[in-house]
Structures are given as C-alpha cells and as structure tokens.
Amino acid sequence: MQTIDAGVRQIALLADDSTDWGAQYGNDNTYVRVLKDLTDWIHELQQEKNDDGTAKYEGLKDTILYCPALYSYTGAGDAWYKDIPSNVQIVMTGGRTFGVASKDFADTFTKNTGRAPFMWINWPCSDMNRNTAYQYLVMGGQNNFLKPGATYGTYDGIMLNPMQQSEPSKQGIFMAADYSWNLWQSEKDGQQSWEDSFSYIDHNSPIASKGSRGLRDLAMNMRILNDGGIDGAHKDAEYDAVNKWWINNESVDYTGKLDVKGVLTELKGKLDGGTATAADFSQALTVYTTLQRAAKNYRANPGDKNMFDQIEPWISYWDDLTASAIDYITAAKQALAGDTEAAKATYATAKAAFAKSDTHTIADYYQRNKPARGGLVIVRP
C-alpha cells in the first residue's frame, strides 16, 4: 500500500526463486487465492474517490504480473493456471533460466494451461560475469533469444533482464521492441533490426553517424552471453559448453562487408599448420585496423554521453587490443621477411599493449573490479 500511495500504479507477485508452496499446500489454496484476493483488492482501490470526486488512485491498473516459482516451465502441465483471473499475466522464462521467446514454447504452454505466456527473457543479461575473470557486453544474440514466427496473441508480453550496464542494454531493448511490434518472420528480420539499432541508441535517428557506425563495428564482436552453465547442457548449435556461453554470431558481419570471422579463422588455421603467408597477415591487418578505427571514431563522436561513459572501459580495451594485434601481425611479417631483430622489438611492443588491454576495469555483480574484454570468440589474439 505504501508504494501505491507513493505513485506506483501496477503491482506484481514475483515468486521466482521462492519455495513452490503450491506443491506443499495446493495451488488453489495459495497462488490462485492470493491472485484473486489481490485482484479484488485492486478493484476496490480503483473505486476509491477523493473529496472532489476524482479517483484517489488515478491510473491504477488491475493487470498483475505473476511469476511462478517454477518459472522456466518444461511442459509439466500446470493446468491450474486456467483458474487464475484473466487480468493476471503469467511470467515464463522460456524452457530454461536463460530461455527463449519462441512460438513453439508459447504454443506448448498455451495448449497445456489455457493461457498465453508473458515472456521474461534473461537477455542481454550479463549477471553471470560474476563467474568469469572479465566483464563483457552482450550486444547481440537475437538469433538465439528472439525466435521468428510469432503471431499476434502468441505472447501476453515480453520483458528483458538487461545487462549490468543500463545504457548499452538499450540495444537489446530496441530489438525486443521491434520483435514485438513487427513480428519477425525470418532471421533476416532480426539481423536488420540489429543493424538499425545503433543509430537509434546512439543519437535517436535512422541515419547512421561516424560514431554509431564505430559502435556497431565493435558491437559485432561483443555478442556472447555466458549462462554460467546454470541450465546444464544445451542442444543449441551456437552454445559453447566449454566456455558456457552462446556465441550469438559473434564477429559475423550481417552485411558481408567485413568478414572478421572468416579472415581470422582462416589465419589461425594456417598458423596452426605453419602455412601462413604475408598476404594472409595483410588480410588480418585490415580487420584489426578497421576495428581500431571504429574505436577511435566512436570515442571521438559519441551521440550519447551516458552511453559512452558506460561503454568507455571497453573502448579503451579495444584501443589497446587492436594496437597489440596490429603489432603482433607486423612482427610476424617482419619475421617472414627475415628481419629478426625488428620482429623481436615489435613483438615486445605488442605484448605490452596486450597486457595493457586488461587494465581497463569495471565492477561486476559483486562489485569486484575486473577487466573489460570483447572479441572473446574470434578477435582476441
């Protein structure tokens, strides 16, 4: 009641991570009853008037979000959901903790319960960086967390769990809004939304700027999402069980203009096989030079100071990482040309820059300072 008096106009009953009291006492005696009582109470408050006849709690909604203790829903039934008042929206994470908004999940849930789910997607959530030695940004991943094919009525709604950094989380929020409004019917719809997002989150315009293009080029290499293995093994093709992260098309350029993944993967294969040539290194040099320029362009032309301030540790990381990679490549080319002494000196410079890239820290979930990193799948040397 204190929050409503303070101005809150919608309430929720959030039982996630709580005891499943329904299993002990019966759901009709616990959550169904509580939700019916809450609904009746809100309806009573909606009828209250001030002395002048105006509504005492103007704008108070009777729409209640209810998140069950068993919020992931694995298809076990729960037909009792049909007894929940129609004004209550049932929150589901989509089959696992780091779940997915998909028509398949929603159709199964609706068939078994008689209700459409309100999706709570733990994306672009970066909470699990509490288990890593570094801090990362999740600037993509719609291909794994927002599946095309939904129609009107598939979901009651969608909400996201953002990153620890609120401003760059707007990139995921932009895509979720586009997904909900335009109902993506193909993966290309999601790719286009990803491309379109940066000019809007940077300077609220459909026209890209030098700064937003720089942010976009870096974000292409900062897409992973680590779930810490909380849900066990996944069958997802893009889930790396060793690193416990979704790759999320990291370093894949949807426009095809800069083949970061292709160039660097091919170079690594040739290095492992001892067949790399100066031409191979030159292609990689183009990749790292482009990323170095992207960091400089975003630093010099940010459209939103708050956004830049939260991302800055990663921009400094990219400054040093690309300088390191460029020097490593230069040293390799010098060695191939027979200039051993120059190669040694350049290698030492590269090594120092690489070490410096880990000095740009930011507090994690538990307020422990850790280095900001990106390009963890392909780009980081």
Q: How should each PLM-predicted stretch be described?
A:
Residues 1-9:
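Chitinase-like catalytic core of GlcNAc-active glycosidases
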